[in-house]
């Protein structure tokens, strides 16, 4: 079985998560700063390191289910990934509330202020997106 990678794609950062080898549990992996790193190449490296071409991508939607303007940017980024990564399989998932849930989890865990939230919220959001997908496919 192959691992899945998930992406929470933003203008500044991309949260990355991966599944366990059985495709049951999602875990935060890293946050890519798009201004400091060639993000498409880094994601290609992550796919290679994890021997996968299965990438779950969160698509931003409004509360009523309509796609937000950001969804168009995410799809443009997906096209860049497809050009870089051979045989890439993209699975789109509604990402409504993933960042809000991640933010709430981190607030609860960070009562002593040890976690710098903005550095981890995106990868936690990516893990929520991936876990949502893994749970749906059971």
From Swiss-Prot:
It is found in: Cytoplasm. Its EC number is 3.1.-.-. The keyword Nuclease applies. GO terms for cellular component: cytoplasm. It is an enzyme of class 3 (hydrolase). GO terms for biological process: rRNA 5'-end processing. Coiled coil: none annotated. InterPro entries: RNaseH-like_sf, YqgF, YqgF/RNaseH-like_dom, YqgF/RNaseH-like_dom_sf. GO terms for molecular function: nuclease activity. Keywords: Cytoplasm, Hydrolase, Nuclease, Ribosome biogenesis. Could be a nuclease involved in processing of the 5'-end of pre-16S rRNA. Belongs to the YqgF nuclease family. This is Putative pre-16S rRNA nuclease. It comes from Fusobacterium nucleatum subsp. nucleatum (strain ATCC 25586 / DSM 15643 / BCRC 10681 / CIP 101130 / JCM 8532 / KCTC 2640 / LMG 13131 / VPI 4355).
